[in-house]
């Protein structure tokens, strides 16, 4: 792990496309701004962990549940086309 020391107003570059801005340091809190391409996900770590857990849960969902949901969508689409 690379550890850097920065003061308020200074920046850190990650690759060619990502820049971290140290906006404010107040006590034990640091406000950071992130400039990144639109396609790059930027999340607080605890939010990222929840997203990963939800993705794993969805990927391991019971096949019968998925088939039932697909059947409901088919029924809804048939009603719309009538």
Curated annotation (Swiss-Prot):
<comment type="function">
    <text>A translational regulator that binds mRNA to regulate translation initiation and/or mRNA stability. Usually binds in the 5'-UTR at or near the Shine-Dalgarno sequence preventing ribosome-binding, thus repressing translation. Its main target seems to be the major flagellin gene, while its function is anatagonized by FliW.</text>
</comment>
<dbReference type="GO" id="GO:0044781">
    <property type="term" value="P:bacterial-type flagellum organization"/>
</dbReference>
<dbReference type="Pfam" id="PF02599">
    <property type="entry name" value="CsrA"/>
</dbReference>
<keyword id="KW-0678">Repressor</keyword>
<keyword id="KW-0810">Translation regulation</keyword>
<dbReference type="InterPro" id="IPR003751">
    <property type="entry name" value="CsrA"/>
</dbReference>
<dbReference type="GO" id="GO:1902208">
    <property type="term" value="P:regulation of bacterial-type flagellum assembly"/>
</dbReference>
<comment type="similarity">
    <text>Belongs to the CsrA/RsmA family.</text>
</comment>
<protein>
    <recommendedName>
        <fullName>Translational regulator CsrA</fullName>
    </recommendedName>
</protein>
<comment type="subunit">
    <text>Homodimer; the beta-strands of each monomer intercalate to form a hydrophobic core, while the alpha-helices form wings that extend away from the core.</text>
</comment>
<keyword id="KW-0694">RNA-binding</keyword>
<dbReference type="GO" id="GO:0005829">
    <property type="term" value="C:cytosol"/>
</dbReference>
<keyword id="KW-1005">Bacterial flagellum biogenesis</keyword>
<dbReference type="GO" id="GO:0006402">
    <property type="term" value="P:mRNA catabolic process"/>
</dbReference>
<dbReference type="GO" id="GO:0006109">
    <property type="term" value="P:regulation of carbohydrate metabolic process"/>
</dbReference>
<keyword id="KW-0963">Cytoplasm</keyword>
<dbReference type="GO" id="GO:0048027">
    <property type="term" value="F:mRNA 5'-UTR binding"/>
</dbReference>
<dbReference type="GO" id="GO:0045947">
    <property type="term" value="P:negative regulation of translational initiation"/>
</dbReference>
<dbReference type="InterPro" id="IPR036107">
    <property type="entry name" value="CsrA_sf"/>
</dbReference>
